[in-house]
Amino acid sequence: SCRAGCYIDYREFEDAELRMLIDGVLSSKHITAARSKDLIERICGLSNKYFKTSIKHIHSVNDWSKTDNNALFYNIESIYKAIEKQIQIRYDYNKYGIDRKLHKSSEQRVSPYQMILHNQRYYLMAYNEDWNDMVFQRLDHITDIAFTEKKATPIKNIKGYENGINYKEISSAMPYMYTDPPEQIVFR
């Protein structure tokens, strides 16, 4: 029999998939608590009206370890634009002080190549033009990004990257994204 009204016959995501997306947002250290709540609300909107009531852990967003850097999403957009345009960028690289706030550490001028999600952190893989070295810097420590007019140094011109980026090596040989060569140590 036909009932009057309308209904959605197909959904883009199943509820289990939406729960996985929500868990990813919750566990993401690089998304602020406020942004996490907003994203989770929008993800819940992709299902029916009963889905939100089945998600109990939404209200625990503030209990998770989250960044305070609200500029992260702007940083991601800006860096992607610079990578697409193949231009250098300048930014302030910061470190957390004992007051748990970011403090400017240095100004960087880099050729950006890739953003890498590793150990629940976003890193910028870039060639530091002043140090003449590849760097991996946490996106939540970057502020005040500015585009330059200079073209990015092609990655194939950098020693060790003539064949491009080896993601397998990066993820296994550099667990904390330090670029120094690995050294063997002996415990006695």
Question: Each PLM stretch: what is its role?
Answer:
Residues 47, 83, 119, 143-149:
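Short, well-ordered alpha-helical segments in soluble proteins
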Residues 125-188:
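Surface-exposed, charged, gly/pro-rich loop-and-adjacent secondary-structure segments at domain edges
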Residues 7-97:
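Bulky hydrophobic/aromatic content
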Residues 80-135:
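Loop-centered beta-sheet repeat module
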